[in-house]
Amino acid sequence: MTRFDSIERAVADIAAGKAVVVVDDEDRENEGDLIFAAEKATPELVAFMVRYTSGYLCVPLDGDDCDRLGLPPMYATNQDKHGTAYTVTVDAREGIGTGISASDRAATMRLLANPESGANDFTRPGHVVPLRAKEGGVLRRPGHTEAAVDLARMADLRPAGVICEIVSQKDEGAMAQTDELRVFADEHNLALISIADLIAWRRKHEKHVLRIAEARIPTRHGEFTAVGYTSIYDEVEHVALVRGDIAGPDGDGSDVLVRVHSECLTGDVFGSLRCDCGPQLDAALDMVAQEGRGVVLYMRGHEGRGIGLMHKLQAYQLQDAGSDTVDANLELGLPADARDYGIGAQILVDLGISSMRLLTNNPAKRVGLDGYGLQITDRVPMPLRANAENLTYLRTKRDRMGHDLIGLDEYEANQNTAQPGTAL
């Protein structure tokens, strides 16, 4: 497995005017870009980039700067398969020669990053390609364009970068892949990071949720307060059902009983027997109500372990043909579990929780919530609700996904007498 460097090192290098190597997902471009801050552009940096890349040097900018500098899309209808937002090409109007030299392009790059520059400071077309980054950066679009702007911002520089794809030194005509990029980075003392790690870093260190509303919700389990949140960048709405005083007797939000429940329309609403989601939600509400103090956090956007409702229904078709729940996802070209718990962790922190007892049979959920400043003092098992329809699903969760399902062995021993819908 390729060794990646820390995001902290990459940010420090960007701030110091060095280049870094950034790789994206192998299912996307699967390429590595050299990236440095546009305001730090020098003839030497540009010449180095030209030597080891395709030479098609681009300057990612945020949308406000693109508008201020009069940089419309290169083509009215973007047909790029990855949605790269090319704008019209530019050169600096003054102080350069033809615009193509490393010195000239560095001057144009610095001018693009200069907050005092304006549309009239550039000629069009030119030899530098500005790109429009998506608002929200890599959290909205996991591309090199957004990574460059994010890294510059994180380095307390202007939100403008310089990027270009690194070419292979081993296979003429090809782009460098991850293993070769690691060697390249080491040879030139450059940090090598992944966009996936950059996304994870931002989710961990930045606040991405807003508390929108609160309302009293009487249920058959008792009364809860529904606290509504929205995720800033993907606009997904989540609800925390809160029981009692979260601060608790010590006033520090410690030892709170918490269930982080992934949205499941088929199980939670329609009562599908293919999964145990509905019974788990019901049990969690009951356990928190009996505790008198706790939270059931309902995470939207987690349908089908994060693959979405339509893909989940397609996975059901494959399961009916013999695949298990893990292989069905993989056959669709999707991960076995695409859920991210960073937003959930931020909501729990916002509610004032410092430590919790986590209601789950899934050890991975504990790992997913760890590291966000939350202390998990205990994992409380959820009661099993097995039936003939979800038995294969539960076996797969136990055998392939590591879930601790207390009572499943007993149910299996008696399954010959069980009827569809019979619960344990």
UniProtKB/Swiss-Prot annotation:
Listed binding positions for Mg(2+) 2 are E29, H144
Annotated binding of Mg(2+) 1, by residue: E29
GO biological process terms on file? riboflavin biosynthetic process
Alphabetical list of CDD domains matching this protein? GTP_cyclohydro2 (cd00641)
Looking at the UniProt record, the site noted as Essential for DHBP synthase activity sits at H127, E165
Please give the residue ranges the record annotates as the region DHBP synthase.
1-204
**Molecular function in Gene Ontology:** 3,4-dihydroxy-2-butanone-4-phosphate synthase activity; GTP binding; GTP cyclohydrolase II activity; magnesium ion binding; manganese ion binding; zinc ion binding
Q: Which UniProt keywords apply?
A: GTP-binding, Hydrolase, Lyase, Magnesium, Manganese, Metal-binding, Multifunctional enzyme, Nucleotide-binding, Riboflavin biosynthesis, Zinc
Q: Which reaction does it catalyse?
A: D-ribulose 5-phosphate = (2S)-2-hydroxy-3-oxobutyl phosphate + formate + H(+); GTP + 4 H2O = 2,5-diamino-6-hydroxy-4-(5-phosphoribosylamino)-pyrimidine + formate + 2 phosphate + 3 H(+)
EC number, UniProt record: 4.1.99.12, 3.5.4.25
Give the required cofactors: Mg(2+); Mn(2+); Zn(2+)
Q: Which family does it belong to?
A: In the N-terminal section; belongs to the DHBP synthase family.
Report what the protein is called. Answer: Riboflavin biosynthesis protein RibBA
Naturally occurring in which organism (per UniProt): Rhodococcus erythropolis (strain PR4 / NBRC 100887)
Q: What is the gene name?
A: ribBA
